[in-house]
């Protein structure tokens, strides 16, 4: 075992990396309320794992979507548990995100020199809510269909660009297969990729600047 470790140490300087991570200064005022951001990341990883598992059975079709979700819940081994964990962790992710934003705001963590960290965090909040909006409609039941119709119709109230935005979101004049395909693509590829990039940027900034001091 030591030989394996020494082999990696010689090439990657693993110990130096470990020392850098473990020796980072943590201010004495940090408490449990500073863990909300890490819990958001934990929920995101759970979402990725459970969501990936369901992609093997889910069919993004207006004809088959509901039946495929029903199949996951009733016929796939532990499918009901995987989908339930996905739903619960989604709700928990939104809750932890809201608490994290409030904690950062109330403790002044958005002030100079951490303005860009705050901007990436707020952008991540928008991405998190977008996860909920797109995922809610994927079962394509009555609730999902009408939620999709209402959400995609909201931009119509915006002058000039409203109607084109509605067409882009729906993929046509009305809600249908193109809309479901867009929501599925956004939920399983576009938003996870955006979240991963933003989280990495967010954490690197925190790593560089450290945790903000007390008020």
Curated annotation (Swiss-Prot):
Keyword flag Transport: yes
Single GO molecular function: oxidoreductase activity
Predominant location: plastid
Binding-site positions, heme b 1: 100, 202
CDD domains: Cytochrome_b_N
Keyword Signal: no
Cofactor, how bound (note): Binds 2 heme b groups non-covalently with two histidine residues as axial ligands.
GO CC term, one of those recorded: chloroplast thylakoid membrane
Binding site for heme c: 35
SUPFAM superfamilies the record matches: Transmembrane di-heme cytochromes
Cofactor(s) named in the record: heme b; heme c
Bilayer topology term: Multi-pass membrane protein
TM ranges: 32-52, 90-110, 116-136, 186-206
Keywords, comma-separated and alphabetical: Chloroplast, Electron transport, Heme, Iron, Membrane, Metal-binding, Photosynthesis, Plastid, Thylakoid, Transmembrane, Transmembrane helix, Transport
GO terms (BP aspect): photosynthesis; respiratory electron transport chain
Job of this protein: Component of the cytochrome b6-f complex, which mediates electron transfer between photosystem II (PSII) and photosystem I (PSI), cyclic electron flow around PSI, and state transitions.
Family: Belongs to the cytochrome b family. PetB subfamily.
Misc. remarks from the entry: Heme 1 (or BH or b566) is high-potential and absorbs at about 566 nm, and heme 2 (or BL or b562) is low-potential and absorbs at about 562 nm.
Subunit composition and interactions: The 4 large subunits of the cytochrome b6-f complex are cytochrome b6, subunit IV (17 kDa polypeptide, PetD), cytochrome f and the Rieske protein, while the 4 small subunits are PetG, PetL, PetM and PetN. The complex functions as a dimer.
Name listed for the protein in its UniProt record: Cytochrome b6
Species name: Phaeodactylum tricornutum (strain CCAP 1055/1)
């Amino acid at each position: 075992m030591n030989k394996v470790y020494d082999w990696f140490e010689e090439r990657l300087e693993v110990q130096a990396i470990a020392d850098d991570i473990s020796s980072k200064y943590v201010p004495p005022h940090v408490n449990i309320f500073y863990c909300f951001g890490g819990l958001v990341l934990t929920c995101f990883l759970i979402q990725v794992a459970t969501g990936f598992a369901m992609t093997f059975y889910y069919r993004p079709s207006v004809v088959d979507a509901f039946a495929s979700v029903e199949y996951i819940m009733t016929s796939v081994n532990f499918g009901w548990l995987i989908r339930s964990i996905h739903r619960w962790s989604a709700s928990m992710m939104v809750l932890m995100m809201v608490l994290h934003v409030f904690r950062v705001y109330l403790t002044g963590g958005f002030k100079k020199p951490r303005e860009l960290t705050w901007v990436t965090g707020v952008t991540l909040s928008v991405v998190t809510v977008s996860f909920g909006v797109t995922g809610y409609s994927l079962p394509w039941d009555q609730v999902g269909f009408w939620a999709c119709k209402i959400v995609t119709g909201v931009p119509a109230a915006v002058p000039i660009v409203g109607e084109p935005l509605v067409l882009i979101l729906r993929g046509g004049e009305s809600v249908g297969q193109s809309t479901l395909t867009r929501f599925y693509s956004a939920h399983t590829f576009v938003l996870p990729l955006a979240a991963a990039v933003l989280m990495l940027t967010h954490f690197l900034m925190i790593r560089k600047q450290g945790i903000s001091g007390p008020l």
